[in-house]
């Protein structure tokens, strides 16, 4: 389990002081001023208050304001990097490690939404425990020395169920969401006030010594405001004034709100925001959502945004005047239970983020962006010193430079020996061609679609297109199962499901249609959510249809079958006739036409409506609903069609096993379990088995690719929905050319495979052994092929040229605040995950190696000593750094530019696997 990392109190205080001195030096302070400022408002006070809420402050109280250039922390402009991390998409035990990895990656701020439906599941009943313990999360952020950006909303979107709105909200008489509607405004104000009051009570605002420096009201309302006319405008203005009236003492923002009032900072959400400017000169340029990836839908390919393009977008933002940028997401996490949004969004919210769904660093994205953040921080004294616009120099038809300095810079001459603070960004926005540009008395080569950062207006510290970070290959990869579930087995194999799972499975059949005393009958088709109140994905509709002998004879003579049609369904509809599944339809408000086999006499017709995440985006969410719309008709009878819409329908909410809680360890006696036999696959079946936990502390993943669709519980915890829906064969390419504007369909992967096979099981939900796994399976599958794995980087690799930049650690700030670099050779760095060591070097070559990670090969030029030298430096260590130089390896081929390529294997301390238990 993750634990909060911290040195002893005295050492930590010294570290805090050192960090403060570095910050003040970045701001251009003298050494004397830095020491004087050490007792000022920016000092972090450590050890006085932990996450148990004890007395004292995390920081010396400080004010947060802003000017046209930046957010001001304690009166000082800051260039801030923010990391999006939604607390309910991880477990509390994961939070300390995740926050620490955000900080290590260069983040100053943690950003999160506040999820209304998680905190107020029933009207007036509040919940702030477990994954929804917002106060604990905020205190952990502060304990790590980071700031918090709290996006209260309370509309979140976030690909979260119903956009974060509680479903009970739609039942309030006369309510209309997100417009000038009194019932809605009253509930919104009550909840926002609740959150603000709680934050004040816990002393979490900056002026109280807490971490919160920014807040958001509403969310992307400008995208839909036009749908509401003048009522939308009035609502937006009301929301702003309501927020300001809460007297939080820190700035409020509204994203994608070009008409935001003067007192509110309007901000940008997009893949690129370098061209964005707020609606007033008095406001700083803030990027609230930098989409560094994208979400996935069931049956879709997996989005991927290359690290080079993500870095390019961020560098351009700061180059052109940006001051605070937030990665959406830096850690995406998991839509546990039924929190995934709709329509049809998957359980994983990995988002191709720098930290993956399980909390492991995604390399090279995390490392490349960390290097970018370091380079930007080296430029911070220059960036904050410019009050107006930087110097702009046109370097070519598609090349440009922005120069930030404390005085006028003559860009035609060398900056060597110049004492003033100066940093420059050189951009090549050509998508295809390299460019050689002349500035500062020398030539610089710019790859296509890239930015070079020169913290001293002379030396390049970083280029967005040249990756120096390692690449990691995981034991569990998204979209890499050995089985495709397009063709389900018709016979169960009853073979071993892996080294941790029991080979014994038990089954229990789910009742089709009505099963309990809480069912009711009414004429007509009722709207799904009006009946279920979203306490279950499932709603049964059952009626009876009388079929005459004339109908049967008619079908026999024509060689046809009657069909059931429904005008519109969402998300999944299943049709049962006399207890047997006849067919299904999947889609968002699509029509259904299902041929069915009816017999003479009374036939029981049962429809099952299934929700796969409530709509999370758009106008008029309260009207979107679920279930069926329009007419339900039986066609193809001898006397014509029969309209069943207004028939007497019996309604049953949920599954019998679900409401009997047969997934809970203490409720195993509530179902009639029988040992699974080698038999035909049956839909609507519950399965259970026992399993042991993989040794160590690595995250745990379960492969459900052999199953169809359903839900999975571990020790009573609903890990989420699963569905082995296959993505189309087309839409992915074998290689990804990142230059050029990115969108979510560019560089997709996983075509022709199930969108999600692997599912996260948090370790804190597990015991060492005798863990209970329960599945509800709707369509049929083979549970004996389910497997369990520990998730970690099994292979790390890197390739660095001898002409790469010096390591960023060679840079520092002089007392004047000017950036300076010491002469240093490039370095190749490798690092395994926490608790793992480099166990073997599987490839190493200094010379002219070819290929990439997992595909390296030696070239004609190769230093024979490479493998031995790299092995000596790295094996047995968690991380290592090797100078890329002839001084280390000798010169195997004079006059030839050489690279060092290394591939290494990472291993946990112990790879011994627990024997699986039997039930």
Swiss-Prot record:
- In the record, which residues are listed under signal peptide? 1-31
Q: Catalytic positions?
A: 220 (proton donor), 289 (nucleophile)
Superkingdom of the source?
Answer: Eukaryota
Single biological process term from Gene Ontology: plant-type cell wall modification
Location(s) in or outside the cell = Secreted, Extracellular space, Apoplast
Q: Name one GO cellular component term.
A: vacuole
The record's listing under Pfam families reads: BetaGal_gal-bd, GHD, Glyco_hydro_35, SUEL_Lectin
TM segment ranges: none
Q: Which residues are glycosylated?
A: 63, 412, 530, 546, 855
E.C. no? 3.2.1.23
Chief place of localization: secreted
| Keyword Secreted part of the UniProt annotation | yes
Enzyme kind, highest EC tier? hydrolase
Q: By what name is this protein known?
A: Beta-galactosidase 15
